[in-house]
């Protein structure tokens, strides 16, 4: 098997992995399923691990995976919450690492889309992934970027385990407020997500207010209040929303412990915790454990 270094040093190998991954990232964990336009239905598992934004932070990714390797090779399912590129110095390597994990452990790994795996009409700032492509592969970077965008468009947006939790990058869409089922709210069965639902899933953040939502200072998505959280969880009869998107030191909670934000790119943001959330199944429920992995600067 080619290593991360070999793949990211050879444009044809990098392109090959990107192209191959477009069909692999939609494979659900064993016992689960996938519904158009990009909803992973998770099976029950003894435990789940949630890894937040990585943003090209290969050192934090290595530290977390080294610490969690027994769970990866055991019975846990690992859900990555998106934002693999932009900001950090090892963006190609970090994206390659998670794609190789999905390729080799596809029944244990879920790769969700973040707002930094953007549609062409909603580019984040910074979006320096194209710059890193161009400095590595000066003659082929435009083609590689288009291939990357094709891959990003195939990444699932949501993972749901009914009766327990919703995992996504930003927040639930406001359609939960007027829907009678989560299938309606998340546009299950459609060929593609509407632009509004996609934007809110990728860009929204929680706010500690007992309201529906406020305008977001990000310029995309919304600030969703407790009423949105409560309605989203009512639709799946669940207990938790698990998300990334915010640069917190490890793991934080909102809405009386119903919303968990996980952030893992510790070195890029000069934080001392690479956050991981672990859910362990016990007595007919999943018990949350916030983990702080101390990052190593060694690669």
Cite the ranges covered by each PLM segment.
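Feature recognizes metal-dependent phosphohydrolase scaffolds
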Residues: 1-299
């Amino acid at each position: 098997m080619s290593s991360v270094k070999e793949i990211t040093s050879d444009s044809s190998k990098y392109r090959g992995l990107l192209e191959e991954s477009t069909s692999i990232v939609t494979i659900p964990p064993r016992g689960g399923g996938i519904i158009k336009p990009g909803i992973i239905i998770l099976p029950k598992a003894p435990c789940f691990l949630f890894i937040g934004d990585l943003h090209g932070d290969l050192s934090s990714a290595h530290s977390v995976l080294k610490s969690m390797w027994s769970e990866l090779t055991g019975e846990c399912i690992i859900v990555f919450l998106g934002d693999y590129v932009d900001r950090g110095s090892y963006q190609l390597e970090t994206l390659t690492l998670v794609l190789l994990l999905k390729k080799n452990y596809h029944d244990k790994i879920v790769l969700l889309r973040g707002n930094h795996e953007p549609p062409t009409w909603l580019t984040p700032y910074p979006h320096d992934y194209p710059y890193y492509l161009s400095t590595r592969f000066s003659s082929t970077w435009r083609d590689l970027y288009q291939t990357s965008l094709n891959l990003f468009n195939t990444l699932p947006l949501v993972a749901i385990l009914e009766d327990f939790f919703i995992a996504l990058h930003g927040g639930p869409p406001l359609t939960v407020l007027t829907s009678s089922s989560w299938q309606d709210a998340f546009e299950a069965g459609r060929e593609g997500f509407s632009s509004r639902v996609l934007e809110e899933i990728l860009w929204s953040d929680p706010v500690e207010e007992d309201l529906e939502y406020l305008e977001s200072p990000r310029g995309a998505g919304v600030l969703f209040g407790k009423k949105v959280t409560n309605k989203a969880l009512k639709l799946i009869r669940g207990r938790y929303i698990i998300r990334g998107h915010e640069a917190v030191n490890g793991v934080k909670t909102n809405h009386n412990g119903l919303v968990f934000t996980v952030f893992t790119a510790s070195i890029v943001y000069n934080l001392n915790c690479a956050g991981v959330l672990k859910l362990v199944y016990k007595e007919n429920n999943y018990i949350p454990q916030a983990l702080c992995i101390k990052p190593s600067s060694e690669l």
